[in-house]
UniProtKB/Swiss-Prot annotation:
Protein name listed in UniProt: 33 kDa chaperonin
Record key words, sorted: Chaperone, Cytoplasm, Disulfide bond, Redox-active center, Zinc
UniProt record similarity statement: Belongs to the HSP33 family.
Molecular function terms from GO: protein folding chaperone; unfolded protein binding
General function of this protein: Redox regulated molecular chaperone. Protects both thermally unfolding and oxidatively damaged proteins from irreversible aggregation. Plays an important role in the bacterial defense system toward oxidative stress.
Pfam families cross-referenced by the UniProt entry: HSP33
Gene name per UniProt: hslO
CDD domains hit by this protein: Hsp33 (cd00498)
GO biological process, one term: protein refolding
Species: Thermus thermophilus (strain ATCC BAA-163 / DSM 7039 / HB27)
Principal cellular location given in the protein's record: cytoplasm
Annotated Gene Ontology cellular component terms: cytoplasm
């Protein structure tokens, strides 16, 4: 389990969110069988999504989704997080790898390549606010800071770090986001810039001094007052963070509706049932022939649950009007697509 801290620095001129995500990133690595550099890429994105969720989400039921589409061998990644510290994510090519940089560090930028960062904010009403910005470096932290400035008009510093060891296991992972509040004093900004310039990097600080020690170095001379989260029910004064997927056995079975009855019957004949793998978390769901044959022609939106296709009383099928769901997701029906395994 990870944890998230929140607070203010510089006499209230700086809003700070920090996360320790070692266990979360290691679980993602294990679930998806990630290469070392893919681990760093997804780990940075998952940590960054947790930070942005604290900075941007206004209500408990909102979610934020980061989509990185690049020209590099990774093929892209997708991460989703909420304000409760829940995060999940995946990459398109989990075993993709590139040589180390000249300084011996993992080359996340080359693995991601040139492209764009898309950020979706999903509201309880089903509305989705989307913003897309070009990737600055593909290293994730710079790209998120660029997004905050270009799309949210929030000047921020974003630091993300993932260190792997041995066979690729995650040794340490975490991140910090510092948001400059309106009217911040010049001396506060000057001190923050000087501290950032003197930092040896976030990952060494996390490894040697932990999350609190990293914050002390980053905010030296600025003071850091932690937000009291106990009033919100977080008795340890921090938000627990964890890898948490919203998939379940019922949703996995519904995914088989995207196959025709003939295709499902072929699964039963050849495989003795059906198998569905969640692309978000890698969980495997197996279904018996009886379960597969019990499916009815009903398709719901994977995000908001709205009915897309359902049987009417006369036996015919009714289809949702339009090509976009109320939550903003593109409507995909069995004759139009196949689910991602």
């Amino acid at each position: 389990m990870g944890r998230i801290l929140r607070g203010l620095a510089g006499g209230g001129d700086l809003r700070v969110v920090a996360a320790e995500t070692t266990d979360i990133v290691e679980e993602a690595r294990r679930r998806h069988g990630l290469s070392p550099t893919a681990t760093a890429a997804l780990g940075r994105a998952m940590t960054g999504a947790l930070l942005l969720a604290q900075l941007l989400l206004k209500t408990p039921k909102e979610r934020i989704t980061l989509r990185v589409e690049g020209t590099g061998p990774l093929g892209g990644l997708v991460v989703e997080a909420d304000a409760f510290g829940h995060v999940r994510g995946y990459v398109k090519n989990p075993r993709a790898e590139v040589p180390l940089r000249e300084d011996g560090k993992l080359n996340v930028g080359e693995l991601v390549g040139a492209g764009a960062l898309r950020v979706d904010r999903s509201l309880p009403s089903g509305e989705v606010y989307t913003s897309t910005v070009p990737l600055v470096s593909g290293e994730i932290a710079e790209d998120l800071a660029h997004y905050l400035w270009q799309s949210e008009q929030i000047p921020s510093a974003v630091l993300l770090g993932v260190r792997v060891k041995g066979e690729g296991e995650v040794e340490v992972a975490g991140g910090v986001a510092v948001q400059v509040m309106p009217g911040a004093k010049e001396e506060v900004l000057g001190r923050l810039e000087a501290n950032l310039k003197d930092l040896p990097g976030l990952t060494p600080l996390l490894r040697e001094r932990g999350l609190e020690g990293a914050l002390e170095a980053l905010l030296a001379g600025l003071g850091f007052e932690r937000t009291d989260l106990r009033a919100l029910g977080y008795f340890q004064n921090e938000i627990p963070a964890r890898f948490r997927c919203r998939c379940n056995r019922e949703k996995a079975l519904e995914a088989l509706v995207f196959f025709t009855p003939e295709e499902r019957e072929e699964m039963i004949v050849k495989e003795g049932g059906a198998e569905v793998v969640c692309h978000w978390c890698g969980e495997v769901y197996r279904f018996s022939p009886e379960e597969v044959r019990s499916l009815v022609a009903e398709v719901r939106c994977p995000d908001c649950g709205a009915l897309w296709l359902y049987p009417k009383g006369d036996g015919t099928l009714a289809r949702i009007e339009g090509e976009t769901c109320r939550c903003g997701r593109k409507v995909e029906l069995p004759s139009e697509t196949r689910p991602q395994a």
